[in-house]
Amino acid sequence: LANELKAPVVADATSGLREELAHLALTDADALLRENPPAILLRIGDVPVARFWRDLEDIPSTEVFSVTRTGFSGLARPSAVVTGDLEAILHALGDVDPVGDVNGLRAMNKRRKALMEELLITCPDSEQAMVRAFSCFAADGDCIYLGNSMPVRYWNSFAQMAVPTENVRANRGANGIDGQISGFLGVSARCSRSWALVGDLTAMNDSNALALLPQLDTGTRVLGVINNGGGGIFRALPGADVHSEAMRNLLVQPHAYSFKAIAEQWGMRYLAIRTAEDFDQLDALEENSQVLAELIPDREQTE
């Protein structure tokens, strides 16, 4: 359907189609669509984890249609929903006429993508570049898990799109740091090679879940933790710089902790990744190894 419509596509991290639809997909779709809201948005499948889906609540000019097996609109505002088996519904549509890129989004996206790739090269130790590098290694797994907001946003915008990664799960929400490692272990329980990417506060909040490791089937598991010294998303929120230092500390919860002791406590191999070259440690992981990879980005490059 996407290839027939030839319209711009937001290939959500959890869709399993990011790589297959790369020729139609928008890079940094959240920002691009906020600045250029489409007149019509067609959602196929489950509710996306991308930020723009939440922004639709405040963009009533965009008419939303959903085709979903659950019947759940995923929006608090009015929208149209078609419920049923996706394959049957799409087959019933028959041939569709191409719509094309009526708003010129792909042209704008092309410029953004070129700039993004240049920045990833010039800032190799930024959070964004580290997520790109981590995604390249994670592509060899049969399961990928993302939690909470920033890992999901980064994956949508910066993860590799060359190697298909069909089994991607994500969890985010108002209490999004709760139970994320538990969620990863549950998702990966039957996987032979699985990868997860979470934030530092998220990992601290559920680190005791790693006690479950001996109860799981054998398999290689890599838990990637972005340690940016606190809740990095709260540093980037609009108006964050106008708060008092005390309020910023309450929001960000800054810390100087390492995750090495947590890895040792639960018998995991610990890897510290501070530079692009440090990712070489992920090249040859032992079979059935349990790894905690602490990604420690450069804040100046990130900003």
Question: How should these model regions be labeled?
Answer:
Residues 1-65, 163-189, 193, 204-211, ...:
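Glycine-rich, anion-gripping cofactor-binding loops and their flanking helix/strand elements
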Residues 1-21, 142, 154-158, 220, ...:
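Redox- and metal-dependent alpha/beta enzyme cores, enriched for Fe-S-associated oxidoreductases
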Residues 14-15, 46-49, 70, 149-151, ...:
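Short glycine-rich anion-binding loops that position phosphate/pyrophosphate groups of nucleotides
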Residues 23-29, 79-94, 255, 269-275:
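Short acidic-hydrophobic, aromatic-tinged amphipathic segments that line or gate anion-handling sites
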Residues 42-44, 66, 146, 196, ...:
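Redox-cofactor binding/interface segments in oxidoreductases and associated redox assembly factors
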Residues 64-103:
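Terminal amphipathic helices with adjacent charged low-complexity linkers/tails
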Residues 107-191:
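Active-site diphosphate/adenylate-binding microenvironment
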Residues 154, 159-303:
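Thiamine diphosphate
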